[in-house]
């Protein structure tokens, strides 16, 4: 008998940085991947050439979220996992309407995973005990709060809470966990002074890079028992 085709892993926001690194990690393991992207970065062409299914999506509206869900439903009969990596970063600053800031943060970090988890639930079920996963990417600020990014922190805290609710709803077929990172990697334009200030915020004083996230994702995917948990990835920052 031929080998059964693996079910794809869905990664939202997979066109750059951590999402892109995760996509390549799974592709290199011969694991089918579906990636959402909003902006067509050159890296998307590389993913497509490597066999990934890349779907352009606009998560700024609920209609856009559901249109993306419909495309996923048309493309596969099942999913191995959903990794909710799509994110946005908006601060409260002069001239930015506060209602717009809050609505934007809640839309991408709460409405989008909430709607996708419900819409794609049937693709995750029916594959066996603890055979599927949902992983939410939250943030270190869920624990600490943020005076400069209040809406962002609140939206990530809501996503953290949804982790436990969906874990209760979908067990034992689907494990639902979250990863709460702080600094993982710098942007290219970050200057030396900023980098040193950021590094000093954690005990480990390093930006570990995408591999640290990949290893933790692999751990959650291979576990048959861990669910409803938030795993911090902060280098001991909470002890500073």
Curated annotation (Swiss-Prot):
Superkingdom of origin: Bacteria
Keyword terms: NADP, One-carbon metabolism, Oxidoreductase
GO molecular function ontology, one term from the record: dihydrofolate reductase activity
Keyword Iron among record annotations: no
PROSITE patterns: ADH_SHORT (PS00061)
GO biological process, alphabetically ordered: one-carbon metabolic process
NCBIfam families: PRK06483.1
Protein name in the entry: Dihydromonapterin reductase
UniProt source species: Escherichia coli O6:H1 (strain CFT073 / ATCC 700928 / UPEC)
Gene that encodes it: folM
């Amino acid at each position: 008998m031929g080998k059964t085709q693996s079910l794809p892993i869905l990664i939202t926001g997979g066109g750059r940085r951590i999402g892109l690194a995760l996509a390549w990690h799974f592709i290199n393991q011969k694991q089918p991947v579906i990636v959402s992207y909003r902006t067509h970065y050159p890296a998307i062409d590389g993913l497509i050439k490597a066999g990934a299914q890349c779907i352009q999506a606009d998560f700024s509206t609920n209609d856009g979220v559901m249109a993306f869900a419909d495309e996923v439903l048309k493309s596969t009969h099942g999913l191995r996992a959903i990794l909710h990596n799509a994110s946005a970063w908006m601060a409260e600053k002069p001239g930015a309407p506060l209602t717009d800031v809050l609505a934007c943060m809640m839309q991408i970090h709460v409405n989008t995973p909430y709607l996708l988890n419900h819409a794609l639930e049937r693709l995750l079920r029916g594959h066996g005990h603890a055979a599927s996963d949902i992983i939410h990417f939250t943030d270190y600020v869920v624990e600490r709060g943020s005076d400069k990014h209040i809406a962002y922190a609140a939206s990530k805290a809501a996503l953290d809470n949804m982790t436990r609710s969906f874990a209760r709803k979908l067990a034992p077929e689907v494990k639902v966990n979250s990863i709460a990172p702080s600094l993982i990697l710098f942007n290219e334009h970050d200057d030396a002074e900023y980098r040193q200030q950021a590094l000093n915020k954690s005990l480990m004083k390093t930006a570990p890079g995408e591999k640290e996230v990949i290893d933790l994702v692999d751990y959650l995917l291979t576990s048959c028992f861990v669910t409803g948990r938030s795993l911090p990835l902060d280098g001991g920052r909470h002890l500073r």
